[in-house]
């Protein structure tokens, strides 16, 4: 049993694998040739597609035999069949299939498959068909000879690439060219497993610099129908290139190299087996000699001083082991040999890293002076200072790592302040009103200074002015026609502030008991009659007064205004519900002989009769100038009355007290639930309340207007007040007085749209 088991043949061992593959290939060639004989018979119905497939299969069988160094059976029948097949190339696709077949046959002829006469005839047929698809190029024999151009290129730019068996080599002249060069690869070719097949492309016109090993910018290379990496026009590396590894694109048997494009010089193209050589650690190099030394002229004004030279390689920033430089380099700085070689084995630019001079491998020189310095100095030395005479000394090295600093350092700025400072955090959630309370609760309006303001400043050089900034009279183009009594202004300016309101020091203003009550300006403007002929010398009027109804008649309506003491009743209104209440502060009234004086203010305007006006006055006139007071924010009218007359024009009667018009709430505000908010925002639930303060609901007009006698007094009009509490308690009080009649609605001025809705 054991003997029989041992004698039983194992599968695959009866015939060698190579012999089995050759036998299968022989059967394939026999079947393909039989089918092709049928297509060349007279009167046979030829299928072009089947004919082309049979030609490609015939070529593959020949290639397999060439790759395995095998000669198939009945090879003597091939020449006659091939000659007959070449006569049937009528269309382009059939010629392409025949070209592939004849390329394989040509290599079979070189291997001695056929007789010499038959081989010559078949090679001639192959060249004739190939000319339809491009020339083959001129061969370049003797590329391995020491004096050849390609040998010099290899020595200069590929010193560690070992050239093996050359598969194809040819030269290309300048101009547009389409080449199709075929070559075959046999398994019996001498090569090692470590060797790779690489493609070399080099220009032979100028080989002094690495530009000669760059790919032609307008030329593409294809192997077996596939583009070579970085050597086709769609993806090309325009710089110096290493030999391209094309092993994966080739196969045993016949291969085809196609080159097409415009050559701008003479090139050599080679495909060969190559290997790599490890660079030596201690190469044999020539010594560096300073070339082009110019003697110092006695008349020269340029004196060469000492130079600082780094002992680190500019490539790796590490200590130089073997100091080298280019033959034509003029500088003292060296670089390391090993670093320079390894970086050019990856990217063969071959230029000095310090001066960018071309330095190919034969031009590398060893600097003996720097080698001696490196041997004598300590290991931690970084730089040396070399004099013009050749003497050198080591610079002091503290061993400390320099701290990074900014490139730009401004004057009077600490360079380390930015590094030592922590992160800068900006608070974007704060309330802008809290910041504005220190300087007043008013919006600052940028305006171009007018001539009247400049004259006002020159007339009051000895007075410390603090004009109010929330001046909105210019929005409605109201002329400053109010003339105040100078004696009243002087009395107000000389009035001392109350102790609990403000105190003045020699260095500036100091304020105490500042209540943090934000003041929000009404978002909707109050309609005000526009003057049709404003004066060019108008400036903002900051006086809170009661204007008369526009009178078309030439007579003037009188408005009497009396000064208001800094401490008294003041009213305000805001759009927020928690501040929508009336505040009052009581203080002893200021006694002055001018308290009972009335200022007659003429106001003129042109508008139709039976028209009421809405006036919003919130500011203090610029002529009020107290030395240590931030100004009276408004003058409250003490007497006002109105009467309606014929279209000739109504008159306004004075009102004795402000309390006759407005009910004042003396309750103290509760600020316990106060919280900051954005300017102009509305808290939930306050929208309707804010609109109630701003919307003026018109009443239905009567069918016939009632004529009133000029002597008959008119009903007291509805009055709306708004409170504006300044952070400075010395400020006067600002009121808004709106005159109107429910039976006679007031038409809106130009540019103001009257709200519509149900009437009350």
Swiss-Prot record:
UniProt organism field: Arabidopsis thaliana
Disruption-associated phenotype: No obvious growth difference under standard greenhouse conditions. Altered sulfur metabolism. Reduced growth in high osmotic pressure (mannitol) and in response to abscisic acid (ABA), but enhanced growth and fitness in high salt (NaCl) condition. Abnormal steady state levels of SUMO conjugates in various conditions. Lost ability to form a high molecular mass complex with PIAL1 and MOM1. Released transcriptional silencing of target genes (e.g.
Region Interacting domain (IND), required for interaction with MOM1 and PIAL1, annotated ranges: 143-301
Zinc-finger ranges (SP-RING-type): 298-379
GO cellular component, one term: nucleus
The name this protein goes by in its record: E4 SUMO-protein ligase PIAL2
Task performed by this protein: Together with MOM1 and PIAL1, regulates transcriptional gene silencing (TGS) independently of changes in DNA methylation. E4-type SUMO ligase that promotes SUMO chain formation in a SCE1-dependent manner and thus contributes to a pathway for proteolytic removal of sumoylation substrates. Involved in stress responses and sulfur metabolism.
Assigned keywords, A-Z: Ligase, Metal-binding, Nucleus, Transferase, Ubl conjugation pathway, Zinc, Zinc-finger
Record field: compositional bias (Polar residues): 492-518, 631-653, 699-729
Pathway noted in the entry: Protein modification; protein sumoylation
Expression sites (tissue/organ): Expressed in leaves, stems and flowers, and, at low levels, in siliques and old leaves.
């Amino acid at each position: 049993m054991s003997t029989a088991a041992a004698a039983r043949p194992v599968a695959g061992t009866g015939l060698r694998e190579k012999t089995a593959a050759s036998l299968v290939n022989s059967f394939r060639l026999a079947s393909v040739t039989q089918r092709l004989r049928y297509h060349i018979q007279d009167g046979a119905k030829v299928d072009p597609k089947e004919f082309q497939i049979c030609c490609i299969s015939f070529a593959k069988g020949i290639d397999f035999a060439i790759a395995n160094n095998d000669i198939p059976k009945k090879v003597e029948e091939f020449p006659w069949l091939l000659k007959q097949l070449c006569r049937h190339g009528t269309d382009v696709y059939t010629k392409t299939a025949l070209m592939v077949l004849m390329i394989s046959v040509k290599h079979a002829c070189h291997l001695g498959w056929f007789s010499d006469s038959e081989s010559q005839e078949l090679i001639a047929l192959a060249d004739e068909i190939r000319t339809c698809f491009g020339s083959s190029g001129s061969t370049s024999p003797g590329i391995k000879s020491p004096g050849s151009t390609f040998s010099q290129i290899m020595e200069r730019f590929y010193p560690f690439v070992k050239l093996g068996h050359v598969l194809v080599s040819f030269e290309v002249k300048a101009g547009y060219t389409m080449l199709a060069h075929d070559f075959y690869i046999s398994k019996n070719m001498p090569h090692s497993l470590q060797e790779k097949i690489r493609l070399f492309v080099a220009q032979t016109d100028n080989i002094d610099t690495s530009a000669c090993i760059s790919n032609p910018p307008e030329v593409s290379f294809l192997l077996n129908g596939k583009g070579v990496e970085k050597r086709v026009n769609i993806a090309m590396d325009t710089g110096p290139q290493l030999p391209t590894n094309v092993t994966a694109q080739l196969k045993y048997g016949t291969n085809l190299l196609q080159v097409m494009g415009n050559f701008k010089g003479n090139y050599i193209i080679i495909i060969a087996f190559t290997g790599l050589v490890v660079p030596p650690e201690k190469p044999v190099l020539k010594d560096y000699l300073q070339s082009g030394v110019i003697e110092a002229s006695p008349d020269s004004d340029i004196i060469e001083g000492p130079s600082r030279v780094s002992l680190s390689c500019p490539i790796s920033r590490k200590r130089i082991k073997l100091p080298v430089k280019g033959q034509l380099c003029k500088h003292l700085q060296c670089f390391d040999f090993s670093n320079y070689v390894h970086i050019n084995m990856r990217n063969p630019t071959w230029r000095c890293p310090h001066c960018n001079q071309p330095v190919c491998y034969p031009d590398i020189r060893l600097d003996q002076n720097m080698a001696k310095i490196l041997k004598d100095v300590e290991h931690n030395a970084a730089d040396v200072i070399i004099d013009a005479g050749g003497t050198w000394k080591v610079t002091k090295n503290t061993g400390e790592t320099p701290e990074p600093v900014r490139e730009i350092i401004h004057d009077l700025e600490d360079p380390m302040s930015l590094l030592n400072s922590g992160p800068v955090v900006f608070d974007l959630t704060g309330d802008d009103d809290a910041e504005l309370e220190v300087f007043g609760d008013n919006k600052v309006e940028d305006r171009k200074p007018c001539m009247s303001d400049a004259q006002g400043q020159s007339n009051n050089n000895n007075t410390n002015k603090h004009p109010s900034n929330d001046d909105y009279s210019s929005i409605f183009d109201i002329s400053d026609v109010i003339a105040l009594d100078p004696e009243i202004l002087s009395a107000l300016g000389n009035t001392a502030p109350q102790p609990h309101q403000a105190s003045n020091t020699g260095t500036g203003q100091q304020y105490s008991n500042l209540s943090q009550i934000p003041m929000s300006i009404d978002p909707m403007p109050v309609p005000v009659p526009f003057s049709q002929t404003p004066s060019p010398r108008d400036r903002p009027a900051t006086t809170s007064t009661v204007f008369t109804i526009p009178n078309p008649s030439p007579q003037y309506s009188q408005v009497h205004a009396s000064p208001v003491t800094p401490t008294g009743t003041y009213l305000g209104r805001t759009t927020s519900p928690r501040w929508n209440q009336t505040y009052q502060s009581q203080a002893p009234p200021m006694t002055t002989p001018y308290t009972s004086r009335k200022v007659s203010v003429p106001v003129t305007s042109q508008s139709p009769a039976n028209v009421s006006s809405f006036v919003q006055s919130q500011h203090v006139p610029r002529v009020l100038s107290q030395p240590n007071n931030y100004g009276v924010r408004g003058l409250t009218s003490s007497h006002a009355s109105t009467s309606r007359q014929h279209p000739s024009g109504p008159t306004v009667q004075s009102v004795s007290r402000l309390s006759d018009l407005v009910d004042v709430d003396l309750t103290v505000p509760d600020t316990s639930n106060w919280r900051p908010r954005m300017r102009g925002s509305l808290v939930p639930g306050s929208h309707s309340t804010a609109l109630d303060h701003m919307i003026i609901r018109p009443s239905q007009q009567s069918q016939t207007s009632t004529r009133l006698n000029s002597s008959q007094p008119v009903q007291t009009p509805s009055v709306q007040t708004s409170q504006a509490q300044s952070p400075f308690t010395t400020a006067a009080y600002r009121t808004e007085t709106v005159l109107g009649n429910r039976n006679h609605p007031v038409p809106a001025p130009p540019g103001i749209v009257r709200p519509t809705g149900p009437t009350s």
